[in-house]
Regions:
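HhH-family (HhH-GPD) DNA N-glycosylase catalytic core used in base-excision repair
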Residues: 1-182
Length: 182
């Protein structure tokens, strides 16, 4: 089931939290490295949970991870790890928190080599889902196939974030996602 159809199957109170994400963020290209990092962290934290849970905790994640500033997160020490493990506003999973910190360090290295995380993504585009998954598994932590697929669809590197009949699809095309550029 597509995300477009999924939202319409939800109860009205759940639809509201998804509607904003669907209409304004999902599938649109992201040009800022910190926001790309944000999306990666949210997708990693969704593993095994509902996307509704993650969307409801989104602002808590933003606060807990210093607005997803890559340099700050990469510099987290044991006290920061403990702070995150005690923060009821986020997902308190050791592997996911560790992945956020280690992936921030990895992105800093990518930024040194490619100038930005986005440039690294653009450098490797286009790839199939399987090729992307292999690359992400070699580069990052806690990035299985579904996490990589959702991260890349949600940021415009893979198609099918929206059905062609969805009104948002035309807005996505105007935003020129990577998958639509030849």
């Amino acid at each position: 089931m597509s995300y477009c159809k999924f939202i319409n199957s939800l109860k009205p109170d759940e639809q509201n939290v998804h509607r904003e994400y669907h209409d304004k963020y999902y599938g649109f290209p992201i040009h800022d490295d910190n926001e790309l990092f944000c999306r990666l962290i949210l997708e990693i934290n969704q593993a095994g949970l509902s996307w509704t849970t993650i969307l409801n905790k989104q602002q808590s994640f933003r606060k807990a991870y210093h607005n997803f500033e890559i340099k700050k997160v990469a510099g987290y020490k044991e006290k920061d790890f403990k702070r995150l493990m005690n923060d009821a506003g986020i997902i308190r999973n050791r592997l996911k928190i560790n992945a956020a910190i280690e992936n921030a360090k990895t992105i800093l290295l990518l930024q040194k080599e490619f100038r930005s995380f986005k440039t690294w993504l653009d450098h490797h585009h286009p790839k199939t889902k399987d090729e992307w998954t292999k690359l992400f598994k070699q580069t990052f932590r806690f990035t299985g196939g579904e996490i990589v697929n959702e991260f890349l669809m949600s940021t415009g590197y893979l198609p099918n974030a929206h059905e062609e009949s969805c009104p948002v699809y035309k807005k996505i095309i105007k935003a020129r996602p990577a998958w639509a550029r030849k």
